[in-house]
Structures are given as structure tokens and as C-alpha cells.
């Protein structure tokens, strides 16, 4: 049996590796079930081991080795393992079977009963019989894997008597390896040896076979797509090996320092990474002797380098060295001598010239040393800062002032790190050494910030950063000084023509997180007084109000500030409604700011919004009901968004209580806790949703109902059960209202209520009810306005069905698709069908809207074939409608599912570029922009149609900025992904055609046109 299997294996191995593996599995099964012994297998292959055909010998050994590798680890007794080991070792002289022999030895080493005392014999045999340079990469890899097993499992069986021979053999065997796959293994094994054993007497040998690979210059060949090893992998492995034993220090560090003085930037970076790793890994004493030499080798890279990465890495290395030095020796004479040497050189450099570059580099070195601890900061400050800070700055050239500000920024960053910010727990016990310079520096920085022309942005930005750091340090500035700084920041942040206003706003926000009480006493009164003055003087526009309020919202991130802001804004709203000269612009700006503020806090997952639930909601509903005649729909929409943000993050019990009160307010003539004033209560008593259908001013309040209900959990009983009465009233609102905002709110609420309903059968029952089926009559026989309203309702209903994968969703979409053939209804049908698949900000998962996995893909797969079928038979205006619909559908589904269909769709999309509908152009351009990268070969077939269309769009000012910009991006991506030979014919036409775009009124378009034009110079 065994001889038959051996013959079958030898026959199969050349034909199919899988067949050969099956034979090995059968042999293993025979041995495990005792139907064959390992001796039988060895006997069966014996005749092949002496065959003159080297291929046959190799196959025979491979069969035995593979079998041993697949056997259970405890299958063979120690006696058999020893015999087989001797068999393999005796064959090491056969170079042609070395690969297979090594595989077998490795399998034996992994056997549970391998006699560990034999490991020395294995090593001796391998060292004496292997000549690594002779072998191919795969053979060397198998040999290295044998050594890997030895080092992983048997290293401690290498005794002190055999250590030297083992080390010598390892150094000889591992030397000169060049293949990156093998090198990774070599580095790994060397690291284990070096980190396990003292290498006394072998430092030079191990260093030579390791450091010879520095620097790593390996780059994977372009065709090596399956090579997983990168240059960075090799660099990391070499680095870890070189620092595995600090016995290398006397050899490695001088070599690295030489590299730092005279090498390319990339090699210097690699050398610094090794040095940093050595400082982190070795005993401090192994490298402290070289501290001065290290500084001399890197100081030019820090003080004069033009490469930021190299400079930052050198500074990091200096900081690591100094930190370890200080931790080991404290303020010893050797440490202070090292620091003094550096500080003296820095002082000399600054005395020679004070400019941005010299100050920045010197300050960075100072920070690397001083930031180690409060004690080191004080020492460095006392020994270095006086010579710098006493330099005259006022009335000096701007370049010199900029340099000093750069220097101060580094210094104060150290102070923030060591002495802590306001509200931080860490505070140094030692007095701040910069307190004696505070008045002078605060005066200088304040003058640079507020006394310099606005257009000197660079120096003012530097001053702003420094003064912010000064204000952040705990107990550094007095209350009056801190107030003064906040006043400076207020002046800048609320001056909308100041180029650094954005940074000033960020500083105010950060200081608000540290000292909110100060902002309440300075920034808030300042901002609200300016708002009040502008309202009184009637000198500001809506845009100005929005800018003021935007800054206030931005700086009110801290909880108490946010609460104060909300209170102030609501009070301002009340005052406006009481005023005889109410500013509609201000009211709209306030409610918009409230909406933005609550959304931003929800996006940041702030936890305090539920605390606004009852009180703020009452005030908002009361204000809106009391002033519904004077509030426009836009204001109500912003209030609705605020209500939604508050309601959706509240817990179940609050939502349950809220929906009950909302029902009382909108559906019953009973008192609701959402209304708080007597006059407003009377108005609310006369109001119901049904009654509002005959009064437009009350009908607008439907917007608030949508905001309140839209964010409710789908687990609420009110949401689980479909409320037919409410849905029918909302459908009537869609037909009655004259406001697009009210209409869209009612439609969104209809979709939300249906989508969240618990039972599919309840939804099916509603769809078959008269209230819905009668809509089809209005689509086909109603007035254009009625048809449009009916289509909108049906589309939003279907949106709810499709997104939750209701069984009637796709059939309803097909019925809507058939309405494109109706006269005077086609445009409305396109818009309605596009709604189904288009994302809506109010109908999202955050509002518990159900969106089943891959629902868009399902819709596309069902509807797109129908659309394409209609396009093939339609003509004239009808075809344009189908093209518009196709573009809208494709533009709102994941691009991955469209790409496979592009060969048939692309010609149709190109026709969409000539349509006047902006949304169609935008969707089409988005798809084309993706296709340029994904389907280059397909697009090249249509360049003569595509390029003229893309050139025409950005020159047409009727197209909005976003469309013109996207068309230019599509044009610009063509030279990046399309073969040059295909574009040469169009080169001159595109370059000339883009000239008008260089004068576009929008800078972003001009910039993109210039960039695109440059790409076409091919």
C-alpha cells in the first residue's frame, strides 16, 4: 500500500499540487490508523533516495518531510524521531535536496518527543554543511525556519560551553542575506538572541552582520504585487534588532552620528529613529557618554534644517535623551554641563541675529530641554531667558518682533504643560520664573496684537497665540489682566472684517472652557450690547446678526455658557415680540442660531440637552402660538429643528409625556402643559389641527408638530400604532397649504409616521384606505396643483415603504413611474420619484427613521431597468423626463452598484448634461467624476461628446458655482486617468476653451479652472 501511494505522489507532484497534498493526507491517515508505519514509508521511498535523477530524489525527500509535517505532534516516539533526524542530517551534503531536508528537520523539531539534547548536533551539522549563498531563496528560507524553531523552542539548551560555537555559526550563516522575506526572519531571530544572551566577545560580529543593512534602501519592484513586505517593515525590524542589546552602544552610536553629519535627509531620519529607540530601550549608562557627541551631530539639523520632519525628529531625540539623562542623574554636574553647553550655543546664535528662523529653532531646543520638568524649566529659564527676554523689542523691525513672538510661543507652551491651565489639577509648587517678565511681555504682545495694522496678519496671529497661552496658564494673569485679554479677543472676534477673527473666536471658546465666568462678564455683555445697539440703530442686516450670533454659539461650548446663551436668546426673542418695532431679521437669526447650537451639541454627544426639555419647549411653543401671525415659516422651521434636537435625545418617559401634551395641543380642545401664558392658552384652546385647515396663519404651526413628532422613538405606543386620523389631516394640509415649508413638513411627518409603524399590515391597510386610493384619482383627473400634491404625498409614503423594504414599496414606485406619461404631470412625477431614493436630513437614523440594509440597491435594481426600457421607446420631452429621472436615481445610490451598468447608462447620462435642470446636471457630473477613475477605457469612447459638454457647463453663468466647479473637476481628472494619446486631439480646444473660466466671478472656480488648464498641458 505504501509503495503505491509513494508512486502516486511522485506521479502527481508535477501535475497538481492539490493531488499531491491529497496523497500526503492519505498517507498520514494510514499512519495515524496504524495501517502503515513510518518505517514502511521510509522503506518505500528508499530506492528513490539514491536515484541519479535529482528531481526524483528531491520529490522523495519532500514526501517524507510533508508527511512528518502533517502528522500529529505526539505521534512519533523519541526513538523514531532520533532515527529520522539522523537520516536527515546525513543527507545535508546533498545540495539539491537541501530545501526538502530543511523542511523535514523543521518538522522533527516541532515533534513533541524531539530529544532536546540533540539540538547541539543539529546546529553543528547545519553550520558545517550549509553554504547559504549557494542556495535559492526558498531553500535559504527553509533553513532559516529551522533556526527559527531552534531559537524559539531550544535556545536555552545552548550551554555556556557551546555558546561560542553557536554564535559563530549563527553569524556565519546569517551573514549576507539579501532577500527581504528572509531578512525579516533573520532580524527577528537576531533580536531574540541579542535580547536573551550576553554577547561578550561577539559584539563586533553581531554588529557587522546587522548594521551592514543600514540604511535600508529596499523598494518593492512594480510587478511584485504579492510581496507583503515594505521598506518600513524592514526598517522597523532592523531598528529593533540594533537596539536589542546595549552592548552595541560603542559601535552603533558613533556610526549613527557619522550618518547624521553627512547623509541624505531620509537616512538621517532613519538614524534618528534608531537613536530614539536606543534611548528608550537601553540602560541610560549605555548612551549617556555620547550625549555631547549627539548634540554636535544634530544641532545643524535643528538650527538650520529646511526639512520640518527631520527637525522635529531631531528635537524629539534631544528631548528623549535629556529626559532619560535627568531621570537617571537629576541635577548632576554632568547633566547641567550638558544643558549649559547647549544653552550657551543658543544664546550666541540669538545674539548674532534675531529673526523668525533663528528664534524658532532656538526656542524649540529650549523647549525640548525645559519641558522635562518644572525644575529643568526653572534652571533653563534662569540661565538662558534673561539674555533673550531683555533684548529690546518695542519699535524694532517687524521681522525681529515676529522672531520674539515665535520664541515666546514655545516658552509659554512649556509653561502651560508644566504649570497647568485653569481648571487643571496639576500645579507646580515652584514659583513661575516668568512672572518677573510678565508685565513687559504682556505689553509687548498686546501692542503687537492690537497696535499693528490689520493686514499684518502674520505678526498679529503670532501675538494672538502667545496672549492666549498667557491667559490659559493657571494663576499667571490677574483678573484685570485676564479681562483685558478677553476684551482684545472680543474686539477681534466680533470685528467681521478682521482677518484673524476665526482664530480669536477659537481662543475665546477655549478660554470659555477654562474660565466661563469671565466670558459671562465680558464677552456676553459685549456681544449682546452690540446686537442691541445695531437693532436700535437699524444699521445691521440679517447677515450681520447671524455673524454676531454665530460667534456667540461658537464660544459657548462650555455647559454654563451654553445655558446662559439659550436663556439670553429666548429673552431677546420675547423682547422682540413685545417691541412695536420688531426686527424680523433678528428674530430669524436668533431661532436659526438656537437650531444650530442644539444640533452641534447633539453632534458632540453633549449630555445636558435633556435638561432643557420641559422649560425651553414650553417657551418655544408659547412664543410661536402667541406670535404665529408675525412669525414667518422660516422662523417656525428653525424652531421646529430646535424642538427636534431636544426631543430626539430625551429618554422614553419624557418623550411619552411630551407626545401626550402635543396631542392635547394639536388634536384636542384641552389645556396642554406646552403652553404657559394665559393669553396664549386661550388662543390654543381655539386651535386644533383640523380647524387650522381653514386658517393659513394657524396652519403654519404644523411645522412645529413635525419637529416634535419626527424625533420620537419608534417604540412609543403613539408611534407603533398608525394614527389614521392624524395622517389624513396631514394629507389635507398638503393640499390646502400655500407654503412650501409647511407642505414639506407635513410630507416629512407623513413619511416618518408610516416608516416607524410597528406592523406591516397596518401600513398595508392604510395604503388601501380611501384616503390614499383617492389620491390616484387626483393624480389623473385633478387640477395640476392637485395632481402635484397627490404625487408628493404618494412619493413620501413610498419613501417610507422603500426604506423599510415594505412589500408594497416597489409596486407603488412602478405606479408612480407610469405617471410620467401623463400630460402636464411629468415634471412633478420626476420630482416625486426622485424623493423616494434621495436622502432627507429630517428622515434619518438619528430620528429613528427605519432604513433597512441595502434598500437603495434594491430600489435601483428594480426601477432602473424599467426606466431604461422607457428611454429606449420614448421621444421628445417624454424622453427628457426619463433621462432626468435616471440621473436623479443614479446620483442618489451608491456608485459601486452603478459602475457595472455604466456601459449602457453612460451614453444616456451624457445626454443629461444638456438638460436645464440643475439637480440633474449635478447628479450626472458626480457619476461622471467617479467614472473617470473607475471606467477610464469606457469614457475614452465618448470623449468627443463628453469634453464639449464639460467645457460648456462652467462657461454658462446660469449654472450655480457647485455645478461649474464639478464640471471643471471632471475635465481636470481626465488627464490624470486617461492615456495621453486619447487626449491629444482635444488638448488645444480645452486649453483655449477654459480661458473664459479664468475670469469667473467666484475665486474657487477661477482656481479650479487654472489648475485644470495646467493639467491639460500634456
Swiss-Prot record:
Keywords: Cytoplasm, DNA damage, DNA repair, Nucleus, Repeat, Transcription. It is found in: Cytoplasm; Nucleus. Pfam families: MMS19_C, MMS19_N. Signal peptide: none annotated. InterPro entries: ARM-like (IPR011989), ARM-type_fold (IPR016024), MMS19 (IPR039920), MMS19_C (IPR024687), MMS19_N (IPR029240). GO terms for cellular component: cytosol; cytosolic [4Fe-4S] assembly targeting complex; nucleus; pericentric heterochromatin. It comes from the Eukaryota. HEAT repeats lie at residues 857-895, 899-937, 940-981, 984-1018. GO terms for molecular function: protein carrier chaperone. Transmembrane segments: none annotated. Belongs to the MET18/MMS19 family. Key component of the cytosolic iron-sulfur protein assembly (CIA) machinery that mediates the incorporation of iron-sulfur cluster into apoproteins specifically involved in DNA metabolism and genomic integrity. Acts as an adapter between early-acting CIA components and a subset of cellular target iron-sulfur proteins such as rad3/xpd and dna2, thereby playing a key role in nucleotide excision repair (NER) and RNA polymerase II (POL II) transcription. This is DNA repair/transcription protein mms19. It comes from Schizosaccharomyces pombe (strain 972 / ATCC 24843) (Fission yeast). The gene is mms19.
Amino acid at each position: 500500500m505504501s509503495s503505491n501511494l509513494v508512486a502516486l505522489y511522485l506521479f502527481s507532484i508535477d501535475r497538481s499540487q492539490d493531488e499531491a497534498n491529497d496523497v500526503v493526507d492519505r498517507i498520514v491517515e494510514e499512519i495515524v490508523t496504524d495501517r502503515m508505519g513510518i518505517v514502511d514509508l521510509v522503506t518505500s521511498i528508499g530506492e528513490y533516495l539514491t536515484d541519479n535523477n535529482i528531481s526524483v530524489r528531491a520529490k522523495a525527500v519532500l514526501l517524507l518531510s510533508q508527511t512528518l509535517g502533517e502528522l500529529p505532534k505526539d505521534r512519533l516516539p523519541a526513538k523514531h524521531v532520533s532515527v529520522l533526524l539522523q537520516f536527515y542530517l546525513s543527507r545535508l551534503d546533498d545540495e539539491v535536496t537541501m530545501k526538502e531536508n530543511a523542511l523535514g528537520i523543521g518538522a522533527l523539531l516541532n515533534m513533541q518527543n524531539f530529544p532536546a539534547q540533540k539540538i547541539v548536533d543539529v546546529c553543528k551539522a547545519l553550520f558545517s554543511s550549509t553554504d547559504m549563498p549557494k542556495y535559492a531563496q526558498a531553500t535559504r528560507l527553509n533553513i532559516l525556519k529551522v533556526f527559527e524553531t531552534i531559537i524559539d523552542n531550544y535556545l536555552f539548551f545552548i550551554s555556556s560551553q557551546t555558546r561560542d560555537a553557536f554564535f559563530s555559526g549563527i553569524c556565519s550563516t546569517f551573514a549576507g542575506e539579501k532577500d527581504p522575506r528572509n531578512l525579516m526572519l533573520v532580524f527577528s531571530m537576531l533580536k531574540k538572541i541579542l535580547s536573551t544572551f550576553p554577547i561578550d566577545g561577539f559584539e563586533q560580529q553581531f554588529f557587522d552582520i546587522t548594521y551592514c543593512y543600514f540604511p535600508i534602501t529596499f523598494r518593492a519592484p512594480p510587478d511584485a504585487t504579492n510581496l507583503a513586505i515594505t521598506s518600513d517593515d524592514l526598517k522597523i525590524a532592523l531598528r529593533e534588532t540594533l537596539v536589542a542589546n546595549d552592548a552595541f552602544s560603542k559601535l552603533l552610536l558613533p556610526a549613527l552620528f557619522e550618518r547624521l553629519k553627512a547623509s541624505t535627509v531620509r537616512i538621517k531620519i532613519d538614524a534618528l529613529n534608531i537613536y530614539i529607540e536606543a534611548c528608550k530601550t537601553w540602560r541610560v549608562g549605555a548612551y549617556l557618554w555620547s550625549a555631547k557627541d549627539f548634540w554636535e551631530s544634530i544641532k545643524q539639523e535643528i538650527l538650520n534644517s529646511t526639512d520640518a520632519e527631520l527637525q522635529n525628529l531631531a528635537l524629539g531625540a534631544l528631548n528623549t535623551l535629556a529626559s532619560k539623562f535627568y531621570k537617571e542623574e537629576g541635577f548632576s554636574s554632568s547633566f547641567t554641563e550638558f544643558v549649559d553647553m547647549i544653552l550657551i550655543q543658543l544664546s550666541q546664535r540669538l545674539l548674532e541675529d534675531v529673526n523668525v528662523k533663528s528664534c524658532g529653532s532656538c526656542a524649540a531646543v529650549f523647549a525640548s530641554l525645559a519641558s522635562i520638568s518644572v525644575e529643568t524649566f526653572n534652571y533653563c529659564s534662569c540661565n538662558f531667558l534673561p539674555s533673550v527676554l531683555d533684548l529690546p523689542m518695542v519699535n524694532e523691525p517687524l521681522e525681529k518682533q515676529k522672531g520674539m513672538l515665535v520664541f515666546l510661543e514655545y516658552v509659554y507652551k512649556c509653561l502651560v504643560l508644566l504649570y497647568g491651565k485653569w481648571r487643571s489639577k496639576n500645579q507646580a509648587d515652584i514659583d513661575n520664573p516668568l512672572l518677573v517678565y510678565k508685565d513687559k511681555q504682556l505689553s509687548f504682545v498686546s501692542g503687537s496684537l492690537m497696535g499693528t495694522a490689520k493686514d499684518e496678519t502674520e505678526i498679529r496671529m503670532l501675538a494672538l497665540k502667545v496672549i492666549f497661552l498667557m491667559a490659559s496658564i493657571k494663576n499667571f494673569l490677574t483678573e484685570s489682566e485676564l479681562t483685558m485679554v478677553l476684551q482684545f479677543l472680543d474686539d477681534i472676534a466680533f470685528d467681521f472684517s478682521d482677518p484673524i477673527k476665526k482664530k480669536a473666536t477659537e481662543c475665546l471658546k477655549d478660554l470659555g472652557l477654562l474660565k466661563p465666568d469671565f466670558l459671562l462678564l465680558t464677552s456676553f455683555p459685549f456681544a449682546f450690547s452690540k446686537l442691541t445697539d445695531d437693532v436700535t440703530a437699524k444699521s445691521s442686516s440679517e447677515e450681520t446678526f447671524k455673524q454676531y450670533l454665530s460667534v456667540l454659539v461658537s464660544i459657548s461650548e462650555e455647559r454654563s455658557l451654553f445655558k446662559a446663551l439659550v436663556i439670553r436668546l429666548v429673552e431677546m426673542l420675547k423682547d422682540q415680540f413685545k417691541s412695536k418695532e420688531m426686527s424680523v431679521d433678528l428674530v430669524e437669526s436668533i431661532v436659526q442660531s438656537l437650531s444650530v447650537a442644539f444640533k452641534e451639541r447633539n453632534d458632540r454627544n453633549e449630555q445636558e440637552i435633556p435638561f432643557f426639555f420641559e422649560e425651553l419647549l414650553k417657551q418655544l411653543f408659547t412664543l410661536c402660538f402667541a406670535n404665529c401671525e408675525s412669525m414667518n415659516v422660516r422662523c417656525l422651521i428653525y424652531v421646529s429643528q430646535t424642538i427636534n434636537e431636544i426631543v430626539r435625545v430625551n429618554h422614553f418617559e419624557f418623550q411619552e409625556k411630551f407626545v401626550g401634551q402635543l396631542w392635547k395641543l394639536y388634536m384636542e380642545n384641552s389645556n396642554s402643559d406646552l403652553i404657559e401664558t394665559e393669553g396664549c392658552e386661550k388662543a390654543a384652546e381655539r386651535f386644533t389641527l383640523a380647524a387650522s385647515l381653514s386658517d393659513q396663519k394657524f396652519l403654519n404651526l404644523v411645522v412645529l408638530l413635525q419637529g416634535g413628532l419626527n424625533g420620537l422613538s419608534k417604540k412609543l405606543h403613539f408611534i407603533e400604532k398608525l394614527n389614521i386620523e392624524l395622517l389624513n389631516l396631514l394629507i389635507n394640509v398638503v393640499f390646502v397649504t400655500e407654503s412650501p415649508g409647511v407642505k414639506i413638513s407635513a410630507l416629512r411627518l407623513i413619511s416618518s409616521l408610516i416608516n416607524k409603524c410597528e406592523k406591516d399590515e397596518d401600513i398595508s391597510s392604510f395604503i388601501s384606505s380611501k384616503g390614499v386610493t383617492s389620491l390616484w384619482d387626483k393624480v389623473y383627473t385633478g387640477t395640476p396643483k392637485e395632481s402635484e400634491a397627490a404625487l408628493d404625498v404618494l412619493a413620501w409614503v413610498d419613501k417610507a415603504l422603500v426604506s423599510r423594504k415594505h412589500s408594497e414599496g416597489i409596486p407603488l414606485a412602478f405606479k408612480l413611474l407610469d405617471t410620467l406619461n401623463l400630460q402636464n404631470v411629468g415634471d412633478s412625477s420626476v420630482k416625486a420619484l426622485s424623493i423616494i431614493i434621495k436622502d432627507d436630513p429630517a428622515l434619518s437614523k438619528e430620528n429613528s427613521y427605519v432604513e433597512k440594509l441595502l434598500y437603495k440597491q434594491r430600489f435601483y435594481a428594480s426601477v432602473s431597468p424599467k426606466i431604461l426600457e422607457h428611454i429606449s421607446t420614448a421621444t421628445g420631452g417624454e424622453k427628457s423626463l426619463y433621462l432626468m429621472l435616471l440621473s436623479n436615481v443614479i446620483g442618489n445610490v451608491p456608485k459601486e452598484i452603478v459602475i457595472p451598468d455604466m456601459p449602457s447608462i453612460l451614453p444616456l447620462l451624457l445626454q443629461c448634461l444638456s438638460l436645464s435642470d440643475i439637480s440633474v446636471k449635478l447628479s450626472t457630473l458626480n457619476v461622471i467624476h467617479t467614472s473617470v477613475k473607475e471606467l477610464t477605457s469606457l469614457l475614452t469612447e465618448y470623449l468627443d461628446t463628453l469634453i464639449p459638454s464639460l467645457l460648456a457647463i462652467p462657461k454658462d453663468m446660469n449654472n450655480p458655482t457647485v455645478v461649474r466647479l464639478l464640471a471643471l473637476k471632471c475635465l481636470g481628472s481626465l488627464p490624470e486617468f486617461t492615456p495621453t494619446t486619447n487626449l491629444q486631439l482635444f488638448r488645444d480646444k480645452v486649453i483655449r476653451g477654459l480661458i473664459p473660466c479664468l475670469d469667473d466671478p467666484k475665486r474657487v472656480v477661477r482656481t479650479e479652472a487654472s489648475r485644470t488648464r495646467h493639467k491639460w498641458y500634456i
